[in-house]
């Protein structure tokens, strides 16, 4: 019997812009009749997976594209030789001013610094829930789809596996943006986000599920994804951009770390490391020297990197916005100083540049971790990518937190470092030093991949080894003459409510959801950097 699939709100917008096949062209924008698993496969591609879009202005309020500008690895560019060019002012207006509310942890994250206007804060929330709802529809409809041949049965399993994986990844993002970090002591009462698993419109008002309920659903989805995608493995041509059993295991390992379930985190990391389809990038990839005329051969995270297990969505840091110049974002000097001189990531990931007029820049650029090009549509996203190095880091952390497994933790840590640091000699750590070294390595390896913010949150509630710190962001504001007007210093203290985002105001008003406390934030310091006679 034919069934109508109502892809509430999202399908019309997404399917009509995706070339998925004739099936999608035969039906109206808001109603689709599916009769085969292949139809649902097309819907999965068009309305569940995230597209890769070239973000000219870098970080965005969509798709959680702001994650890499709110942690302690980023700041804003400053040059003591600021020129008289007005380009920096134009850059500031385009890149930084509109994301001020996120960068400075404001009550109204959509606030534009220069204009004072406030944009909607619901783009990420709304998009993720639309994609989740489309997953719910697909999982509901696929039960009745014919799968009486080997080919159809394989697709039947695979589509379900991918759908469960995607729902888990999106709920994990929502939970960590709009809920507190998972705390085993309080997870049964801490409010998280609404948990919607049905394909139809609910008649009752939504309420916020508890952190434990949401994480239980995430784990359940990932276990199902692992099972289905083991029964029907992802073909090699699709592995990078479609979920696989290895991707499910790696994400599940991360989820267990968040839950402080060290034993299960280790098991899932081991499963990834044992896979014949997973390998670490060798030191040779980092040893390739940048070519001034063709950077492609020197970039680390590209489609050619064998570490990439899964990637979707856009790259919000690959353009010119992280070049460290006046009016742009820069890499925090503190992060740069963590790398030893023989660590090849130091010279590959980062570099000092010059202004457009070749005057020196005092700030660091994010160089060749990704391919950096203006208006570039990267094939490797900066938020939702999963890669092999994380499995080694997850294994090291999980073992470091367990009694009697310090040697295993060191083994995983040393193997990763041998593929990153020239002439590296294996190290043996114990106790607190081991945990600190694992966390240090995680920061150095996974910087600007959308993980540091969540790591800082979970370290603060770690029962075995809590860690908290103050984050300082300096907002350098240029003038229209290219010099600086002011420098504003903002601090995010430990346990600050801003570690949890406010429920979007439109959603809050409609569903009457319990609020997340968040407060207005003023700079702790304001000073004039450079003031010319003309100013």
Predicted regions, residues:
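Short coil/linker segments at helix-helix boundaries
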Residues: 154, 177-216
């Amino acid at each position: 019997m034919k069934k109508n699939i109502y892809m509430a709100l999202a399908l019309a917008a997404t399917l009509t812009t995706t070339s998925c096949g004739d099936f999608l062209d035969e039906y109206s924008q808001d109603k689709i009749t599916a009769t085969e698993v292949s139809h649902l496969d097309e819907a999965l591609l068009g309305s569940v997976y995230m597209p890769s879009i070239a973000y000219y202005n870098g970080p965005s309020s969509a798709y959680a594209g702001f994650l890499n500008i709110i942690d302690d690895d980023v700041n804003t560019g400053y040059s003591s030789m600021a020129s008289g060019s007005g380009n920096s002012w134009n850059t500031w207006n385009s890149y930084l001013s509109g994301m001020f509310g996120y960068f400075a942890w404001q009550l109204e994250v959509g606030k534009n610094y220069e204009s004072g206007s406030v944009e909607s804060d619901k783009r990420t929330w709304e998009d993720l829930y639309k994609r989740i709802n489309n997953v719910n529809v697909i999982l509901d409809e696929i039960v009745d789809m014919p799968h009486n041949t080997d080919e159809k049965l394989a697709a039947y399993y695979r589509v379900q596996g991918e759908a469960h994986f995607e729902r888990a990844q999106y709920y994990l993002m929502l939970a960590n943006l709009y809920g507190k970090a998972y705390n085993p002591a309080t997870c049964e009462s801490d409010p998280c986000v609404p948990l919607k698993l049905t394909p139809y419109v609910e008649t009752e008002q939504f309420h916020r599920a508890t952190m434990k309920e949401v994480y239980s659903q995430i784990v359940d989805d990932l276990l199902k994804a692992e099972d289905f995608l083991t029964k029907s493995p992802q073909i090699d041509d699709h592995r990078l951009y479609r979920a696989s059993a290895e991707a499910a295991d790696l994400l599940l390992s991360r989820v267990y770390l968040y839950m402080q379930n060290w034993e299960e985190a280790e098991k899932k990391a081991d499963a990834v490391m044992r896979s014949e389809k997973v390998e670490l990038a060798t030191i040779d990839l980092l040893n390739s020297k940048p070519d001034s005329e063709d950077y492609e051969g020197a970039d680390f995270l590209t489609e050619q990197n064998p570490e990439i297990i899964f990637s979707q969505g856009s790259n919000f840091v690959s353009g010119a916005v992280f070049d460290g110049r006046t009016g742009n974002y820069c890499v925090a000097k503190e992060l740069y100083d963590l790398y030893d001189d023989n660590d090849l990531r130091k010279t590959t990931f980062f570099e000092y540049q010059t202004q457009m007029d070749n005057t020196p820049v005092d700030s660091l650029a994010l160089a060749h971790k990704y391919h950096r090009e203006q208006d570039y549509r990267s094939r490797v996203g900066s938020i939702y990518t999963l890669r092999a190095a994380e499995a080694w880091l997850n294994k090291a952390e999980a073992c470091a937190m367990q009694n009697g497994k310090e040697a295993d933790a060191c083994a995983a840590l040393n193997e990763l470092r041998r593929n990153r640091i020239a002439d590296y000699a294996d190290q043996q750590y114990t106790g607190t030093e081991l945990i600190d070294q694992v966390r240090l390595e995680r920061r150095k390896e996974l910087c600007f991949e959308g993980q540091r913010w969540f790591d800082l949150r979970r370290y603060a509630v770690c029962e075995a080894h809590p860690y908290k710190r103050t984050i300082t962001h300096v907002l350098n504001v240029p003038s229209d003459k290219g010099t600086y007007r002011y420098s504003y210093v903002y601090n995010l203290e430990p346990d600050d409510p801003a570690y949890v985002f406010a429920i979007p105001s439109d959603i809050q008003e409609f569903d009457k959801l319990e609020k997340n406390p968040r407060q207005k934030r003023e700079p702790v310091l304001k000073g004039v950097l450079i003031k010319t006679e003309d100013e």
